[in-house]
């Protein structure tokens, strides 16, 4: 393997073999290669303090490289080096006016040994309290550090100026001009050189403190004649030797610093200043906000703003961005903002207030210091006098009257190099800080630099047997690979599969090998393919690397004064700021945004409304998105109410306005600050909830370690979903980012489960399967996670008992709220497979995914509570009856639910186009006039013949009437369309009767099933209906059937069924009678028209023997006898059957039908009597559908004959005179050739030719095609019909005279109606002189 070590902008690739070398050996090789890269000789001085991983972890010097780094990883060196422009310590050619200490004079003059070596014991100095009391400010710094160019760093004796160094009076010791040193002259050239140097150092950390006074090139020359030099160096070397013995490490090249864990414990007092404020009862004039570390811990109160003219500004007590960490005896660290405010108010009652303040300049170092502490506290070392002089003698001189207080025991990032002197306690606003190295080489400012991503762990061999449910885990890798490859980690343990059954594999394990195949350099796709290649029932061998996640409890505070009794603990717990109803508490969070900002805050929110008056109740957290800032922060919870965002209150605003405020604040203010401040209201947990170590339930813990259980989980618990499982506060932050976790350690439920305590889920969910076993990363792309519950029978008998609980108000118990990812939810696959003990009792309908914005603005509510489902009314119907659409807002949902509540059991349906007519009474009358029964049955899925007692929502949703399947208008034209010929109709009736019986049986079964399903649980799929309804979806259709309440007993249904069958039988009999009358009327019309010569007056046409040829249906003997009887009644002989029935001419009939339709359209405004009079001239010619009804079956034949005779006698003569002059114009169509031949053979008469030229009929010239021709339309129809009949009469007379009837006379033809080519051909073949002259029209 090989790694890349970055020295500033220079990167060095170091080959490491198999990686079994130690880190300090890597440092040696990297330094050697770096010297070659920058073209320096081996004597060029370089000091490497530490190596940091690219992900932010710090590598220990004695770690094995392969355990803490991967192949092609990038490491960052934090180092110091010799000035690249000049090498020397005051004796080089570039240095003028300076000299090295005398002790090195002989060495430098005799050989080339580097001057950058530790001082000898004879050249040490010791700073004693007596020297310090003599007001000689001794400030030691490294000459190569430019951080204190403007700070006070001077070495002087009593003869030098005693002015206190400050930012206004910067002084430097070493070779700078302006430094008043005896017997030396300053060099401006050296001062300018120091300012223009190109430094290559990085910000320093606490590990460099012990070497800050060592002899190397980072320190300028001291005068050897100074009396304190020898004693100082001797003391410094003793401290270094003790540190090396404790660490037991071999120092790398450049005498690098030792590990942080073995450094002496330093206090916070060197960066904290004490501010004494006499309390005169007035306000201080400061505005404070919570100051939180990036890891989420509260570090104190931040002075955000000073009031103009206030006490703090006038007396120069505070500055902006100062951090108050302690007030009198109260430590403000790790306190919630409400508790800190309470402590502040308590302190304001004292006469004198002591503020422990971290100046704004030290705030960053203080924040880094807080991150490096591992939850360890040390008592009683906040004040300087409580610390041993052997550790830091420079910190021992401070006012003894200062109050004692506990302090942190971890090493700071930057410590002051001088004590706070009594006379300068208020002279300077902040003490001079320790030197800080130049920042240009800062390559990694990762938040998680305190956490070592490459901690030493253990390797495990795990064998998993692949079953039908797979291996049962998912893997992930880095989003951005380093060097082309990335490690593979186990992301989730699925709720089914081999992994959860085995129980050894955990989320976060790194895969090293799969079946002996090394995964180094392999991509995630290759690893997936390798895992999937395992055969069914085969065994896969996994070699995983698991980092040790030991829980580090807080140390107990040993001071009795800091111990707290149970009564005090209770009192402290009562100080929590609660809402007026006492059910919730206020919490303040500073949530840092992600570097990428891809998911934003990463929460989905919802707006709730009151069920009584529909008032807005506020904005609540609906869900927390994995990978977002809130998820990584780990403090925000589902169902938290957002009170304020970035100081802007959301209270009192409408939901929509609050949503807009939330969006705006997150997008603008959050991006500017890099973090979002949230004030939330959270429901107080129950007393039986498990508490983490250090929670208020543990009275033996001190107040400093006492934390609310939520706050404990916020900062320490790595899996906030299940309390009581392996809490690991040192959870790898970088690994969590890779895993997409929200600070949660997802564990297998078979490993490390508590034995004595009941596992409680957050938000008090039911203790069944832990939710982390589901694939949380894909919760937005899957349906609801299913579960198995032991009390399935209880669920099957329950529905929503009170729809008022459907609204989740702030004071509603979240355990009663519908949880989308919670218990009681099933995925679609589980609903289909019915994973319950008794599947017949359950009928779950489909649900759909709820989509939420990443920013999380979604007006949604949570329904279907657990308690409601367990104790519900079986008669409730809150399913599809609400009539909501997919885009239903919260308001429409609440309104619909409220209406259902007010109306009791009245079922709601989607809006219907009209009121559905029932058929519960007077069925005999309806059968006589209603034609809706006449429609033949279609396929079984259609709603054709609905039974009387059922009415489905399907028909109403599609806009149809559910009972009547056709229009209730029994018109002749509609009847012709709906009813086919009698034979087909009889067959359809038989099929319909049979299908109706089968369908009624099916409905009986469905009703029996629905009786058991009246009290069924209706999920969100019933409340919301998404998409179109599919008719073939039997489950949805059966689930939506609503039973009418018209018939309440079985006797009524049986009686109604019999009545229905009787009505249908009468309907069939009535239809057959109509068909017989219709057949008689048509035949009578034909024979009356084509009868003997004495019938011409009322028939309009001669007898036509071939009329029966147009009837497509042969007559039975019974029908023939009936025809004879009818002919006898009208005293007309019945003609014999024609010899040829194939000579049908449908052209005349079609023309008559078209004229009839035109007449009906134009005659709509006339009365019925006029219409009947006009119809008397029409003849019922046969059509291609001879079985169609004529519509005159209720009129007696004799009455028709008498009326027709009388009307024709009155109008025939007048009509004949008018029609003789009516113009005719032949049409040209596709058969123009045949038409021309027709006109040549039959020349028109003289009267007709003259009539064509008559301008009186010009308005009719263009109306031959059936369109309205003008004002004479009705007369034209009547005259044309009469002319047609007259011509047919004449033609029949000629035929009867010239040929016997047995020859089969052809049907009438008209010239103005072009015949088909087949007709023209037949006419040409049959054209003989015996047939007589043709008729013209």
From Swiss-Prot:
Residues 81-109, 143-263, 397-441, 866-888, 932-1015, 1028-1055, 1110-1271, 1284-1337 are annotated as: Disordered. It comes from the Eukaryota. Residues 150-163, 171-188, 207-224, 1138-1147, 1219-1240, 1318-1327 have a biased composition (Polar residues). GO terms for molecular function: identical protein binding; phosphatidylinositol binding; phosphatidylinositol-3,4,5-trisphosphate binding; phosphatidylinositol-3-phosphate binding; phosphatidylinositol-4,5-bisphosphate binding; protein phosphatase binding. Its main location: cytoplasm. This is Partitioning defective 3 homolog. Component of a complex whose core is composed of ARHGAP17, AMOT, PALS1, PATJ and PARD3/PAR3. Interacts (via PDZ 1 domain) with PARD6A, PARD6B and F11R/JAM1. Interacts with AURKA, AURKB and SIRT2. Interacts with PRKCI. Interacts with PRKCZ. Part of a complex with PARD6A or PARD6B, PRKCI or PRKCZ and CDC42 or RAC1. Interacts with LIMK2 and CDH5. Component of the Par polarity complex, composed of at least phosphorylated PRKCZ, PARD3 and TIAM1. Directly interacts with TIAM1 and TIAM2. Interacts with ECT2 and FBF1. Interacts (via PDZ 3 domain) with PTEN (via C-terminus). Residues 91-100, 1180-1203 have a biased composition (Low complexity). Changing residue 532 to E: Almost abolished binding to membranes containing phosphoinositol lipids. GO terms for cellular component: adherens junction; apical junction complex; apical plasma membrane; axonal growth cone; bicellular tight junction; cell cortex; cell junction; cell-cell junction. Contains a conserved N-terminal oligomerization domain (NTD) that is involved in oligomerization and is essential for proper subapical membrane localization. It comes from Rattus norvegicus. Residues 935-1337 are annotated as: Interaction with FRMD4A. Isoform 1 is predominantly expressed in lung, glandular stomach, prostate, ovary and uterus. Isoform 1 is also expressed in brain, with a high expression in the cortex, hippocampus and in the striatum. Isoform 2 is predominantly expressed in intestinal epithelial cells, kidney and prostate. PROSITE patterns: PDZ. Residues 271-359, 461-546, 590-677 form the PDZ domain. Acetylated. Deacetylated by SIRT2, thereby inhibiting Schwann cell peripheral myelination. The keyword Membrane applies. InterPro entries: PAR3, Par3/HAL_N, PDZ, PDZ_sf.
């Amino acid at each position: 393997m090989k790694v890349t070590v970055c020295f500033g902008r220079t990167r060095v690739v170091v080959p490491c073999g198999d990686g079994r070398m130690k880190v300090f050996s890597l440092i040696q090789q990297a330094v050697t290669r770096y010297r070659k890269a920058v073209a320096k000789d081996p004597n060029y001085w370089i000091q490497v303090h530490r190596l940091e991983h690219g992900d932010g972890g710090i590598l220990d010097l004695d770690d094995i490289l392969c355990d803490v780094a991967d192949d092609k990883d990038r490491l960052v060196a934090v180092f110091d080096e010799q000035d690249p422009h000049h090498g020397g310590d005051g004796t080089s050619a570039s240095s003028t006016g300076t000299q090295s200490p005398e002790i090195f004079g002989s060495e430098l003059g005799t050989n080339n040994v580097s001057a950058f070596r530790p001082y000898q014991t004879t050249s040490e100095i010791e700073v004693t309290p007596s020297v310090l009391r003599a007001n000689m400010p001794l400030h030691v710094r490294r000459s190569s550090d430019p951080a204190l160019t403007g700070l006070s760093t001077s070495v002087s004796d009593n003869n030098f100026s005693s002015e206190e160094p400050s930012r206004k009076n910067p002084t430097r010791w070493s070779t700078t001009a302006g430094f008043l040193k005896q017997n030396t002259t300053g060099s401006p050239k050296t001062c300018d050189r120091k300012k223009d140097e190109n430094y290559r150092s990085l910000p320093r950390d606490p590990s460099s403190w012990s070497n800050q006074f060592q002899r190397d090139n980072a320190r300028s020359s001291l005068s050897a004649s100074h009396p304190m030099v020898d004693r100082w160096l001797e003391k410094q070397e003793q401290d270094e030797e003790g540190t090396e013995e404790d660490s037991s490490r071999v120092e790398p090249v450049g005498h690098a610093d030792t590990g942080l864990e073995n450094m002496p414990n330093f206090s916070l007092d060197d960066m904290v200043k004490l501010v004494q404020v006499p309390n005169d009862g007035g306000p201080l004039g400061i505005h404070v906000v919570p100051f939180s570390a990036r890891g989420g811990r509260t570090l104190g109160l931040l002075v955000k703003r000073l009031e103009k003219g206030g006490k703090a500004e006038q007396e120069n007590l505070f500055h902006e961005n100062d951090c108050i960490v302690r007030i009198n005896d109260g430590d403000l660290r790790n306190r919630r903002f409400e508790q800190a405010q309470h402590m502040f108010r308590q302190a304001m009652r004292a006469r004198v207030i002591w503020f422990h303040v971290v100046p704004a300049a030290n705030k960053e170092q203080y924040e880094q210091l807080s991150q490096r502490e591992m939850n360890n506290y040390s008592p009683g070392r906040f004040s300087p006098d409580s610390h041993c002089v052997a550790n830091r003698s420079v910190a021992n001189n401070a006012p003894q009257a200062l109050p004692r207080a506990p302090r942190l025991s971890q090493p700071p990032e930057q410590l002051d190099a001088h004590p706070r002197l009594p006379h300068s306690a208020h002279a300077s606003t902040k003490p001079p800080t320790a030197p800080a190295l130049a920042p240009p080489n800062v390559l990694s400012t990762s938040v998680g630099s305190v956490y070592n991503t490459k901690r030493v762990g253990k390797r495990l061999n795990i064998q998993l047997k692949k079953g039908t449910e797979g291996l049962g885990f998912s893997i992930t890798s880095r989003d951005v690979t380093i060097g082309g490859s990335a490690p593979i980690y186990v992301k989730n343990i699925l709720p089914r599969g081999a992994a959860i059954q085995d129980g050894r594999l955990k989320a976060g394990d790194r895969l090293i090998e799969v079946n002996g195949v090394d995964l180094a350099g392999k991509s995630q796709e290759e690893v997936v393919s390798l895992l999937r290649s395992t055969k069914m029932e085969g065994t896969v061998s996994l070699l995983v690397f698991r980092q040790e996640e030991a829980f580090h409890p807080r140390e107990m505070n040993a001071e009795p004064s800091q111990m707290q009794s149970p009564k005090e603990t209770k009192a402290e717990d009562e100080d929590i700021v609660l809402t007026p109803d006492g059910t919730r508490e206020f919490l303040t969070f500073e949530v840092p945004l992600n570097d990428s900002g891809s998911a934003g805050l990463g929460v989905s929110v919802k707006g709730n409304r009151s069920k009584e008056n529909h008032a807005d109740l506020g904005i609540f957290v609906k869900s927390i998105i994995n990978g977002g800032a809130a998820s990584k922060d780990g403090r925000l919870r589902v169902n938290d109410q957002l009170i304020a965002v970035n100081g802007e209150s959301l209270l009192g605003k409408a939901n929509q306005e609050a949503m807009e405020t939330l969006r705006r604040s997150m997008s603008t203010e959050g991006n500017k600050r890099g973090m979002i401040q949230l004030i939330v209201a959270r429901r107080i947990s129950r007393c039986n909830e498990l508490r983490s170590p250090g929670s208020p339930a543990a009275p033996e813990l001190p107040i400093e370690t006492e934390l609310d259980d939520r706050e404990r989980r916020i900062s320490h618990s790595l899996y906030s979903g299940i309390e009581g499982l392996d809490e690991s506060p040192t959870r790898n932050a970088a690994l969590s980012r890779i895993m997409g976790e929200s600070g949660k350690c997802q564990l297998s439920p078979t490993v490390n489960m508590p034995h004595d305590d009941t596992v409680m889920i957050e938000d008090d969910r039911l203790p069944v399967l832990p939710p982390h076993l589901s694939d949380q990363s894909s919760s937005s792309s899957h349906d609801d996670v299913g579960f198995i519950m032991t009390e399935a029978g209880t669920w099957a008998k329950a529905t929503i008992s009170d729809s008022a609980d459907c609204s989740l108000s702030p004071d509603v118990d979240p355990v009663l709220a519908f949880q989308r990812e919670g218990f009681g939810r099933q995925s679609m696959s589980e609903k289909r497979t019915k994973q319950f003990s008794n599947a017949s009792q359950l009928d779950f309908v489909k649900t759909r995914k709820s989509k939420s914005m990443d920013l999380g603005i979604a007006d949604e509510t949570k329904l279907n509570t657990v308690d409601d489902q367990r104790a519900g009314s079986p008669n409730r119907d809150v399913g599809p009856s609400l009539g909501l659409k997919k885009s239903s807002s919260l308001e429409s949902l609440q309104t619909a639910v409220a209406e259902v509540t007010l109306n009791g059991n009245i079922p709601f349906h989607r809006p219907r186009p009209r009121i559905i007519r029932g058929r519960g009474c007077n069925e005999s009358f309806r059968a006589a006039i209603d034609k809706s029964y006449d429609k033949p049955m279609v396929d079984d899925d259609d709603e054709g013949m609905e039974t009387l007692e059922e009415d489905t929502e399907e028909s109403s949703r599609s806009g149809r009437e559910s009972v009547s399947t056709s229009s209730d208008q029994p018109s002749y034209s509609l009847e012709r369309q709906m009813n086919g010929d009698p034979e087909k109709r009889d067959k359809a009736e038989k099929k319909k009767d049979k299908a109706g019986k089968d369908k009624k049986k099916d409905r009986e079964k469905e009703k029996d099933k629905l009786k058991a399903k009246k009290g069924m649980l209706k999920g969100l799929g019933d409340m919301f209906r998404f998409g179109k309804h599919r008719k073939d979806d039997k489950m949805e259709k059966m689930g939506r059937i609503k039973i009418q309440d018209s018939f309440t007993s079985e006797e009524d249904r049986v009686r109604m069924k019999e009545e229905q069958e009787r009505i249908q039988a009468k309907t069939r009999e009535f239809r057959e009678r109509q068909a017989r009358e219709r057949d008689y009327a048509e035949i009578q019309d034909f024979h009356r028209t084509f009868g003997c010569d004495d019938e011409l007056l009322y028939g309009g046409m001669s007898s036509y023997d071939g009329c029966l040829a147009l009837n497509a249906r042969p007559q039975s003997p019974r029908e023939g006898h009936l025809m004879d009887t009818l002919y006898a009644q009208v005293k007309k002989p019945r003609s014999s059957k024609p010899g040829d029935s194939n000579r049908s001419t449908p052209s005349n009939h079609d023309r008559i039908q078209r004229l009839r339709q035109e007449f009906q359209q134009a005659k709509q405004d006339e009365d019925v009597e006029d219409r009947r009079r006009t119809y008397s001239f029409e003849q019922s010619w046969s059509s291609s559908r001879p079985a169609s009804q004529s519509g005159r079956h209720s009129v007696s034949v004799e009455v028709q004959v008498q009326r027709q005779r009388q009307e024709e006698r009155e109008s025939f003569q007048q009509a004949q005179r008018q029609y003789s002059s009516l113009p005719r114009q032949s049409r040209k169509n596709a058969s123009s050739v045949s038409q021309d031949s027709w006109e040549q053979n039959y020349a028109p008469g003289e009267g007709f030719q003259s009539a064509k030229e008559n301008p009186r009929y010009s308005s009719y010239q263009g109306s031959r095609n059936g369109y309205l021709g003008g004002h004479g339309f009705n007369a034209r129809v009547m005259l044309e019909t009469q002319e047609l009949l007259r011509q047919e009469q004449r033609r029949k007379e000629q035929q009867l005279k010239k040929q016997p009837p047995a020859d089969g006379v052809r049907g009438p033809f008209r010239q103005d109606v072009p015949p088909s080519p087949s007709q023209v051909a037949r006419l040409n073949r049959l054209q003989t002189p015996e047939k007589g002259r043709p008729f013209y029209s």
